[in-house]
């Protein structure tokens, strides 16, 4: 199934953090926090302004982004755990 978000919504796949610390200690799933970094999978066309014009989003598919701990709504699409959030929930794009 292909999913296209509406308006200023963005679909993000979380990027999982390391399973092990630098010192070699393995972190169990129960002690891990949900990652706040992800890859943009799909973007909507943008929000409309008062004149009805569509304002394009600043992020695009493939961007690596940072977002808040409680941002977005968790969904499962084609067996993948994804987040749908507004572009305003994204704090920034990570330059690689």
From Swiss-Prot:
Keywords per UniProt: Chaperone, Cytoplasm
CDD domains: cpn10 (cd00320)
Subcellular location: Cytoplasm
GO MF annotation: an example: protein folding chaperone
GO CC annotation terms, alphabetical: cytoplasm
GO biological process: chaperone cofactor-dependent protein refolding
Pfam families (alphabetical): Cpn10
SMART domains, A to Z: Cpn10
Transmembrane segments: none
Role played: Together with the chaperonin GroEL, plays an essential role in assisting protein folding. The GroEL-GroES system forms a nano-cage that allows encapsulation of the non-native substrate proteins and provides a physical environment optimized to promote and accelerate protein folding. GroES binds to the apical surface of the GroEL ring, thereby capping the opening of the GroEL channel.
SUBUNIT field: Heptamer of 7 subunits arranged in a ring. Interacts with the chaperonin GroEL.
UniProt family annotation: Belongs to the GroES chaperonin family.
Name of the protein in its database record: Co-chaperonin GroES
Organism: Methylobacterium radiotolerans (strain ATCC 27329 / DSM 1819 / JCM 2831 / NBRC 15690 / NCIMB 10815 / 0-1)
Classification of source organism: Bacteria, Pseudomonadati, Pseudomonadota, Alphaproteobacteria, Hyphomicrobiales
